[in-house]
């Protein structure tokens, strides 16, 4: 996991800032083996996920940010599309892997949903930036830990859609290699 993040970003800080709840990597690999649906908060993260490898495991990756219904729901509720997209993800794919690389508001929505009973297979929380990023990551990690929800979170200000995709790919490649050690990630 660390290797893929460092390779993706050329940033060795991920060896210290990437945090895992107990069993998070195993839960992520198990989700991939079970044909996970991965929901991202950006089309950029979606584009970075290896679709052939995920499809061979029976999974799919989706992003609702460009969904007209999500835009309408966000406008009606006076919130962001990221929040509305996570509401849709929770309603339609409650056991999905949620991969957030951009929107702290998405992390806060996921944390609230978990407190109200949502149990995603895994939450990947790696938004990048300055506004509410650190706080949203810390809250998400604490909520996931206290509710037994697997999570991988890049603490601090670093992260991004590329990091979210790289974590997803590390899980996909690990799952593929467990099924066939010669597969080398099924690229």
Predicted features along the sequence, with ranges:
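Conserved small/polar residues in nucleotide/adenosyl-binding loops
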Residues: 1-5
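A short, well-structured juxtamembrane/interface segment
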Residues: 16-31
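Buried hydrophobic positions in well-ordered alpha/beta secondary-structure cores of metabolic enzymes
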Residues: 41, 123-125, 167
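Short glycine/serine/threonine-rich phosphate/pyrophosphate-binding segments
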Residues: 45-48, 104-110, 130-134, 160-164
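Long, charge-dense
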Residues: 54-93
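Feature captures the catalytic cores and cofactor-binding loops of soluble hydro-lyases/lyases
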Residues: 92, 106-123, 127, 132-135, ...
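C-terminal functional extensions of proteins
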Residues: 131-187
């Amino acid at each position: 996991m660390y290797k893929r993040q460092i390779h993706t970003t050329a940033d060795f800080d991920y060896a210290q800032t990437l945090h895992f709840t107990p069993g998070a990597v195993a839960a992520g690999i198990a989700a991939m083996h079970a044909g996970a649906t991965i929901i991202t908060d950006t089309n950029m993260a979606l584009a970075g996920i290896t679709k052939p490898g995920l499809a061979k495991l029976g999974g799919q990756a989706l992003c609702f940010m460009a969904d007209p219904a999500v835009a309408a729901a966000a406008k009606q509720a006076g919130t962001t599309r990221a929040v509305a997209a996570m509401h849709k993800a929770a309603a339609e794919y409650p056991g999905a892997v949620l991969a957030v690389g951009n929107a702290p508001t998405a992390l806060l929505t996921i944390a609230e949903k978990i407190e109200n009973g949502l149990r995603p297979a895994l939450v990947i929380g790696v938004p990048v930036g300055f506004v509410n990023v650190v706080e949203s990551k810390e809250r998400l990690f604490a909520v996931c830990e206290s509710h037994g929800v697997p999570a991988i979170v890049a603490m601090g200000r670093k992260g991004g859609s590329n990091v979210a995709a790289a974590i997803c790919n590390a899980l996909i490649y690990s799952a593929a290699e467990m099924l066939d050690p010669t597969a080398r990630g099924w690229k």
